[in-house]
Amino acid sequence: MRYRLNSLPDSSLIRYAPGLVLGLFLSRVVGEWFGMPGLWAAVGLALSLGVLGAWGLARWPLGQTWPALILIAYVAYPQFDSRFAWRAVAVTLVAFLLVVSSHRRGATAGTTSSIGPGPVAMMLPALGVALAFLLVYVLTLAPGVLAADSGELQIVAAELGVAHPPGFPLYLMAAHLFMQLLPFVSPAYAVNLFSALAGALAVGVVYITAVLITGKRLPGIIAAVALGSATTFWSQATTANVRSLTALFAALILFALVWYRAAAVAGDSRAADRRLSLAALFMGFGLTHHVSLLFLVLVGLIFVFMVEPALLRSSRRWVGPIAAGALGLLPLLYLPLRAAADVRGASLALATWPGFLEHVLATGFRGDLFYFTAPADFWQRLRIMVNVMTFQFNVWLLVVMLLGLWLVFKRDRSLAVLCGGTFTIFSVVAATYRAPQTVEYMIPAYVAAVLLLAYGLAASTESMSRFGRWGSGPATLITAIVTVGAFSQIVDHQSASGAAHEGTSARDYAETLLAGAPAGSVILSHWHWATPLWYLQEIEGLRPDVDVQFVFPEGESYEATWERRARETFAAGRPVVTTWIPSVPQGGLPAPEPVGEAILFPQEARTKLPGGFVVSDLGVADTVDVVGYRLEAPDGVAAGEEVVVTVAWRPVTGLPPDVGLYVHLVGPDGVLYGQDDKPAVAGEGLALTQFRAALQPGTPPGRLSILIGVSGSATPRETLTETTVRSSSTSPYTRHRVERKLLDASDAVLIGYDWDHTMADRSRLYLHWQAADGYRTQVFDDIRAADLTLPPYRGIWGVPVRVWRFPRGEQSGHYVPLGEGIVWTGETLNGLKLSPGDSIVVDQEFRSARPINRDYVVSVRLIGLEPDGIHWAWWDLRDSIPAMGAIPTLKWVRGSFVRSSHRVTVDESALPGQTLTGALILYDAFTNRTLAILDERIMAENPWIPLCRATVRTDIR
């Protein structure tokens, strides 16, 4: 693509426009940065800089200066937004560089930006791209042991064991070799680093493939950056997992096939055969690594026969590819060879054909494949695939990907089958697959999608450039926007990295459990936490006396399995630690004690305080004596975070039935800003009860009193201890981003506002502020914006504004903050009239302000109320991982938007005129703990978010 410098009309007036826009832009930026005393001062500054800019740039041809016109996007923008201003500057600079570089190439060589597919021309930039992303991944790498499958891979790679089906033998051998080459780092870090290398190589291969397809470097760079900075790809490239290697083999297969086509089209059959054999080798290795790449192999075969239909009749030419493919399958021999080894995951069944095939083909998961095939469910899953893509890529990149898909089907059918077919088949298979890792299973589709991005950018801009002076400008503008969109992902998606997302959370959790487990105890664990526990035991040698057991479903309800396993283990005379938190007290088991986020059923009664407790002597309501407590994070908490305090107590006398304890968080203004209630379950000795109370938004900074009381008692609550409320280091999510700097002496800037209308006939306004010490939120209930008394702020061009307006969302909409930085933004179904048996889809929308590494379940109920409007006559419950399992909260990063669809049905017993309501909660899939709803108005009525106010139709026959 070539951007002509002097292709635009250069009339005497038009040539002043870029300088005028630049001057106006600078005047606005200067005014908003330093402030203006009034409107006329801003007008004077704008006129002065506008005239100066127009005069200054008019000396150059319009073909050189027109990119400054892009800045008009911010000149006309209706509010102060420094981030948008910087994006406009970035697009302008990129457009200017594109024009200048194109002019220099044209002036010196008379060539376009196309390059030949020579190996040096492609390999050196590809190596640079790969090394750049390797550096990015190393700097953002997870520092050590991880949870769930990642933890398992770190163990079995260190031991040369066998992973869960399909086994991943090639991955394990390569990761183990990587450990041997890096003896100075921990095994866990080495496996994480192997993912970084595989991810960086995949990005480099994508660059080469995109250059082969387009003949241009820039689309290749953009495709590589788009993939390397995609949310899930970045996450997988900085943690131990099999997906980075899957991406590498997908990229290598696509590269080899595109390279093969170049030779076949050129008529070089010998080169074509060699490259086809290379593709077959990559296919063999890919299938050895992960059987899901079979779908890419099938697409590749169709592509080959489209390129060379005569291959169907040339059996001799298939000898080399078949041999190469078989060679790629040789790593599968690892499984039977390790069948008898005394390592994790090994089984003698792997040395038998049935056991080998069952493991390699992962037949235990066959019930999940093509699970969502019913039309209604499949349609919902396809909608979710759109959400999956917006979860990964900037919207401008997605637009050009769609454009590339359309253009390639019009112009290049074989390439359309290869790239478009790969994207489509993996999207459809992922849409029908029942598994909570859809965002990861789509990785081969992401590789194909960025190649479509490269094709779409190259083809569309080349087509525009054919229109001469009227096309080169738009082509440059589109290229600049897409370039900035791709590189901006590096900034926007940093929270997806292993360092920011996972960090040391798995080690912290596992070390706490191992440190708190009594000698000879058993830890019953979810898979998520079992693997880091095993790693610390088997690789680092911690607490070999503790038996860590994975609790898997056994046909009964999962909760029943947990309860039975806990009782059986306790009956055998061993203390039991469980990562499962029962929903009700367990009869026949002692009162549990907290161990981190888990609980311990001890064999012996506690007689003294654990280490780290503060001694106390506090009587509460003549019912319990508090003898000590431990406050987590005593240096302070921010609004939205949990205050975690463990209280050691004993009953004064026998406890009354159904008595409970509570903790209240009270601010300096005497207002209650958080609470947690727990049943009072006492044992023979000291009882330990852990309270987790989340602070509501709007909690004022300063002293926070932690009070304890007995439920149902008229005796006042007692002060247990105090802590400090500080500003948050993380910006809250806001639907309506603004930038309003106050003109008073403070450094406060309003960065966003949100209205909530979830409660009937009620409204709430959230104002989100940033200051030097962090972020805080103010909350105003049932108030009009005009009634707020706020100091003037700096508006557009820095002009003071004294009248505050918050128009967006003032009449409708939802904004309910939850724990972990999650915000519920709808939807509700008010006013519906339904018939018995009717099914409706309730779409729930969530946003996240920060990375989340807990797995939350979205629970939606449709409830038919009794005539009293309180009790339930019937209900339909639908619990699932968000987005029908496609986008778990474990994968959410800062700024994530996730839509979760839930189909609920009106019970056949519903009566005409019956009132219907809905309920939404989120709870931890591992601990059963409900995620806090940080709206005291909602919690005062019910412990859930109300989803609808509807009725059953009265015209039922």
Enumerate the predicted regions with their spans:
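Transmembrane-helix motifs of polytopic, lipid-linked glycan transferases
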Residues: G50-A58, L193-T214, L252-A256, L451-Y455
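Membrane-interface transmembrane helices that cradle and orient dolichyl/undecaprenyl
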Residues: A54-Q64, V211-R217, I253-L278, F285, ...
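Signature aromatic-anchored transmembrane alpha helix within multi-pass, membrane-resident enzymes
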Residues: P18-L22, F409-D412, Y455-D492
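C-terminal luminal/periplasmic domains and tails of membrane-associated envelope-modifying transferases
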Residues: E511-W534, E540-R957
